[in-house]
Amino acid sequence: MTDLDYLNHAERALAAIELACDRINDASDADIDNQRTVGMITLTFANRSQIIINLQKPLQEIWMAARAGGFHYKCNSNQWLNTKDGSDFFVALSQHASEQSGQAVVFNS
């Protein structure tokens, strides 16, 4: 994958996270605050816990830090997969965000 392809896929993923936060906040009382800076999104929950998602351009990966730990994802055919177990980024984000917010939330690509 070229650097440009990586950036396009990664930026689409970050935009999808922002849109999902808006949708979740409109449809529930989850109250997920999302702040985006260049190449990074910080999700802050009502209990002040956070999930941080950032781009790792040299490795062409997306990293996620949650209470459960740190996870690395690489793009494979428009899907971000965990570099260790092959799990989907958005499924994992939904799981970690649900745990940290105390209610079921779903993030989609």
Model-derived segments and spans:
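N-terminal intrinsically disordered, cationic/polar leader segments
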Residues: 1-109
